Design a protein with these regions (language model features):
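A cross-kingdom marker for long, charged
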Residues: 144, 148-175
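General structural signal for alpha-helix termini and helix-helix connectors
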Residues: 25-29, 86, 110-114, 168-172
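N-terminal Sec/ER secretory leader and immediately downstream segment
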Residues: 1-66
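Extended amphipathic alpha-helical interaction segments
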Residues: 64-149
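Short, charged, amphipathic alpha-helical segments
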Residues: 37-42, 56, 95, 122-130, ...
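Domain-length accessory/inserted modules outside core catalytic folds
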Residues: 23, 41, 48, 132, ...
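Exposed alpha-helical structural elements
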Residues: 2, 35, 39, 55, ...
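Regular secondary-structure segments
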Residues: 24, 102, 106-109, 160, ...
Length: 175
């Protein structure tokens, strides 16, 4: 499993957010979620947030309208935030919600990018380079209005190189 390659709490929390977003997307598309749920059990255990999985497993009402779906997701997010606060997990919460928000933005724009269960690690998928460049563009645009985001752009920049290097190393090892 590639999840073992996520070393820090922050990476795990971000990956957890990405997988939670994908879980919702797959549920909405009526696609199987077993792989992703297995990864989430692992990540939520590592992060000591077992309660999060119960909140995220709740399904939106069948045939929900866009408004109903949006309301459901907002409520789900609020429940998650409250539970995180009660359990003193604010640090994990920020990273997790960040991962979730970015993944939703990307999947809405390109539904083909849903992470395929545990086959591809949330941190190192072949889609990740695409994701990173999209995030870089978004942060660069927003930095004009939110100066704090400039720092984020600088943090993200070296990531695409790292992902590319890791993926190249993997490919050569696979041969």
């Amino acid at each position: 499993s590639k999840v073992s390659e996520l070393n820090t709490q922050a990476q795990k929390a971000r990956a957890c957010g990405i997988y939670f977003a994908d879980l919702n997307v797959l549920k909405a598309m009526k696609k199987p979620t077993t792989d992703i749920e297995n990864v989430l059990v692992k990540l939520t255990t590592d992060l000591d947030i077992p309660f999060a999985i119960d909140i995220m497993k709740e399904s939106a009402p069948a045939n929900a309208s866009k408004e109903e779906l949006s309301k459901f997701m907002k409520n789900q997010e609020n429940k998650l935030i409250d539970a995180m606060m009660e359990n003193d997990k604010a640090d994990v919460e920020l990273e997790l919600l960040g991962g979730m928000a970015v993944e939703y933005a990307i999947v809405y724009a390109n539904p083909g990018l849903v992470v395929k269960g545990d086959a591809i690690s949330a941190g190192l998928s072949e889609n990740m380079e695409k994701r990173i460049s999209i995030i870089q563009q978004i942060t660069a645009d927003l930095a004009k209005y939110y100066p704090d985001l400039e720092q984020l752009g600088t943090t993200i920049a070296p990531l695409s190189g790292m992902v590319a290097t890791i993926n190249t190393a993997r490919e050569s090892k696979a041969k």
